[in-house]
């Protein structure tokens, strides 16, 4: 936790202590504007938030895609209460607990391929991305491919707020103030309003944009590229569905050139 001292000025003394909004630095928010006209959610049930003034707000993004079964679902609430009353926390460093192994087995039972054999749990999307990048680089080193150190992302992509995710992500404003990872490049985005503005489902236009990965391969050589990362569905940059055949073509190119493919997926499951 980092606490920054205010450069000057006084707190808004008219605000009750229980309503003091000064101390929380909110991510991806215009803090001054928010605190001048706060939107405070007090409860949630089903698909709605309830503000402190009792106004209902439709949650169109399922709590940043974390509550796809709805808010305050009774079975989920009961499961959380039961587990907290039995074992609230157990580290996974040199010890474990039965439900962790059970959850991993359950997840693999949903897998479309027997190639998936292991699950590594993380605490957030940002941590997941940085962990996936580290696993990819470590895997290439472990199998003797020591020159495979280049990571490839896409323009306009969002991969969280860790240094790895910002580096492979394609949002310039997120990179503006930071020194990023070396050995990172990007293919073009599939976002094109002129071609896909009113598409329903997967757009018909844009599969050929997957071929831009060949440009990166020609630039560096496949023997230097460790992994390609993409969002199957780009959420925070517009809920953009990939063109028909795009992901299949990306998969084929990566397989052909011995490049790992990372799907950063938190929305469609």
Regions found by a protein language model. Give the residues of each.
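PLP-dependent aspartate aminotransferase-fold enzymes
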Residues: 105-227
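Catalytic PLP-binding core of fold-type I/II PLP enzymes
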Residues: 240-269
């Amino acid at each position: 936790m980092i606490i920054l001292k205010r450069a000057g000025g006084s707190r808004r003394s008219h605000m009750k202590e229980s309503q003091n909004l000064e101390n929380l630095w909110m991510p991806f928010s215009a803090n001054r504007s928010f605190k001048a006209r706060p939107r405070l959610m007090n409860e949630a049930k089903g698909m709605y938030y309830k503000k402190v003034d009792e106004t209902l707000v439709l949650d169109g993004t399922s709590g940043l895609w974390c509550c796809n079964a709805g808010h305050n679902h009774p079975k989920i609430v009961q499961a959380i209460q039961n587990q907290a009353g039995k074992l609230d926390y157990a580290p996974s460093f040199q010890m474990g607990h039965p439900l962790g192994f059970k959850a991993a087995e359950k997840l693999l039972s949903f897998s479309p391929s027997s190639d998936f054999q292991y699950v590594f749990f993380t605490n957030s999307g940002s941590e997941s991305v940085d962990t996936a990048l580290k696993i990819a680089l470590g895997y290439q080193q472990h199998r003797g491919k020591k020159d495979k150190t280049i990571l490839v992302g896409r323009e306009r992509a969002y991969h969280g707020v860790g240094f790895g995710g910002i580096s492979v992500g394609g949002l310039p404003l997120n990179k503006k103030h930071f020194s990023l990872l070396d050995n990172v490049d990007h293919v073009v985005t599939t976002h094109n309003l002129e071609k896909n503005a009113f598409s329903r489902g997967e757009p018909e236009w844009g599969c050929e944009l997957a071929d831009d990965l060949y440009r990166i391969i020609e630039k560096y050589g496949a023997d230097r590229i460790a992994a390609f990362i993409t969002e199957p569905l780009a959420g925070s940059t517009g809920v953009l569905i990939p063109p028909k055949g795009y992901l299949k073509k990306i998969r084929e190119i990566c397989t052909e050139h011995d490049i790992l493919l990372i799907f950063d997926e938190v929305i469609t499951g």
